[in-house]
Amino acid sequence: MRRFVFLAFVLVLFVIANLDSSSAQVNFSPDWGQGKRSGSSDTCAVCAQTMAQVYRLLQGLEAKLGQSRNYSR
């Protein structure tokens, strides 16, 4: 029983200590229209060439990692 009380006390202290770093939206407005989170679609355009370069880079790193694991055994 004492252990349960101690754990409950520690949990309460943990929650109180972390309340300072947490926040949430309490009031929701039904009239956002397009919404605050919706940005223009052209700003999120992904360049296919850049994505292909990143993909090739990751493939090369994966191959090197696989080789190093095989040699370390």
UniProtKB/Swiss-Prot annotation:
Residues 1-24 form the signal peptide. Contains 1 disulfide bond. It holds the Pfam family Adipokin_hormo. InterPro entries: Adipokinetic_hormone_CS, AKH/RPCH_hormone. It is found in: Secreted. The keyword Secreted applies. Expressed by the venom gland. The keyword Signal applies. Keywords: Disulfide bond, Secreted, Signal, Toxin. It comes from the Eukaryota. GO terms for cellular component: extracellular region. GO terms for molecular function: hormone activity; toxin activity. Belongs to the scoloptoxin-22 family. This is U-scoloptoxin(22)-Cw1a. It comes from Cormocephalus westwoodi.
